Amino acid sequence: ATKSNFTHKTKNISRLVLTDTATAKTVAIDGDTLSVKPAASLHLVRNGAHWQTASPAASAGLRKEHKLQGPVNDAFMESFLCVTPTGTPFHAIANERAKQEQDRFAKMFTREFLGEARAKNDTAITGADIAANNLILFGDPGSNQLIAKIAAKLPIKWTKDSIVVGDKTYSAAEHVPVLIYPNPLNPKRYVVINSGLVASRGATAYGDYAVLKVAKQADGQVTGTVADEGVFDETWQLPSTKI
C-alpha cells in the first residue's frame, strides 16, 4: 500500500478495521475500489458481494473476535470457574447428565493437569467471579440460578418443556443443550453450559453448540447422543444456513 492507496484481498471475513489510514484516499479490496476520507482507522463491511465503509457504531454489538470466537474449548484457555447447581432441576435425568459431565471434567483436569478445577456453588457466585472468569455452568434453569439469569438472552431457548434451536424443538425432559456464548452478564467473558474440555478422553467434540438426547444406562450412567450441533455465526446467533 502507498500512503493514499490501500489494496487488500480477503477470504472468509465480512468486516475489518484498517489502521494507519490518516492519509488514505482509496481502498481496493476484493475487486471493489472505495473512495474514503482519511482517518486514523477505517471500518469496512461486506454487504452481499461488495465492500463498503461503515461507522464504528455499525460494528458494535456481539461479534466473534480473538478470545471470543468459540468453540467450547476456547473457554478453558483463560481463567475459568465451574459453577455447581444447588437448586431443583427441571428434569432429573438431564440434571444427572450435567452432574456426571462436571464430575468427568473434574477428574480429567486432576489427571491431566495435576490440580483441581476451581468450582463454586451457583448461590455463592459474586460480581468479582463474573468479572474475572469464564463461567462453566452445569445444570439447567431450574437447578442453576446463573443459567436462569441468562437463559432468555441465549440464541437457544430453554424452558421446562422444550429446547428450541431455530425451527427445531426438542423435549427438555430427554435432551440437554451444550453451548458456549459471550456471558450476558459480562460479554467480555464466556459462559459454557454443561461441558468441560471436549478434546479429552471420554468427551465428545462439539462446535459452539449441541443438543444431546440423554438416556440412562443399566450401569447408572447417563449418556448423551448428539441430536443437533453447529457453529454460531459471526454475531453469535444461529446462522440462517448451517455452518
Residue ranges of predicted features:
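Solvent-exposed alpha-helical segments and adjacent loops
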Residues: 7, 15-243
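Surface beta-strand/loop "capping" patches
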Residues: 1-12
